[in-house]
């Protein structure tokens, strides 16, 4: 494999980034490590590339400081690969590629906080059922309750929300969960909201609307890239499309809701999903 790193005196950041991440296989390896597939055999199965090529890419990503190799078995010797701070810094690149592919290559280029029911995004989200949410560096949306309802939303009152299909409704959605929080608790479920807004913005929103459950910031796009969640761009920010997951205490996604055309109706649907899962 030929790697072409930019000259140390080249002032172009893109050139330097391409030298580390420009190889397509390296990007897919980074995608899958971000998604919790940290062991060699897992990466072979997910990427479909040969073991020799995978070993080369992993060695290069470790050498460039994107991944760290950690031993998890002495006999036989086995290693897993985890993101370094540099690797986590590349997550917005993955999110941008995902959004570009969804919006411009698989879509018509129009920003949308929802999705067509027959879209690739819907297929990807529904495919999360049975998948475990990996441990993340900056946030953890999974609680110790039997179930956690994780609802992702674009962000309250973001610029241009009224011009984007599905953009309006974040405050109503959060307040509906607030008003029905006791019903979820009675079913052994907690509620967590996630957006890519900064923690300070979320704290102000929670205080103004008396939100009594966690609102978590995925500003660094860890959860977004781990689960390959659909996003769109608005107000100069990558924003999560409106989507909901029911997760069990083992971190496994048990049910999903996407797209969400009715924010208050989705809260009722989430209650129904928890109720059905509780009955086994």
Residue positions per predicted region:
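Short glycine/proline-centered loop/turn elements that form peptide/ligand docking sites
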Residues: 19, 36, 53-56, 60, ...
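Amphipathic alpha-helical dimerization/coiled-coil segments
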Residues: 92-131
């Amino acid at each position: 494999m030929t790697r072409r790193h930019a000259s140390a005196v080249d002032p172009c950041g893109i050139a330097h980034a391409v030298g580390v991440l420009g190889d397509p296989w390296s990007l897919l390896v980074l995608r899958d490590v971000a998604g919790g597939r940290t062991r060699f055999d897992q990466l072979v199965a997910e990427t479909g590339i040969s073991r020799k090529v995978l070993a080369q890419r992993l060695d290069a990503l470790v050498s460039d400081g994107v991944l760290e190799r950690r031993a998890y078995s002495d006999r036989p010797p086995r290693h897993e690969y985890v993101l370094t701070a540099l690797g986590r810094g590349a997550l917005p690149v993955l999110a941008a590629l995902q959004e570009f592919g969804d919006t411009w290559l698989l879509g018509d280029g129009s920003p949308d906080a929802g999705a067509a029911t027959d879209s690739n995004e819907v297929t990807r989200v529904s495919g999360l059922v049975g998948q475990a949410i990996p441990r993340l560096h900056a946030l953890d949306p999974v609680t110790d309750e039997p179930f956690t309802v994780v609802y992702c939303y674009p962000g309250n009152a973001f610029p241009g929300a009224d011009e984007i299909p599905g953009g309006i409704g974040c405050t109503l959605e959060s307040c509906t969960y607030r008003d029905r929080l006791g019903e979820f608790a009675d079913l052994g479920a907690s509620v967590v909201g996630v957006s890519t807004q900064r923690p300070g913005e979320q704290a102000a929103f929670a205080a103004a609307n008396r939100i009594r459950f966690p609102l978590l910031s995925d500003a660094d796009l860890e959860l977004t890239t781990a689960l390959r969640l659909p996003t769109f761009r608005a107000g100069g920010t990558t924003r999560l499309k409106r989507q909901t997951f029911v997760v069990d205490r083992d971190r496994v996604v048990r049910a999903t809701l996407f797209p969400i055309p009715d924010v208050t109706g989705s809260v009722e649907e989430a209650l129904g999903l928890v109720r059905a899962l509780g009955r086994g």
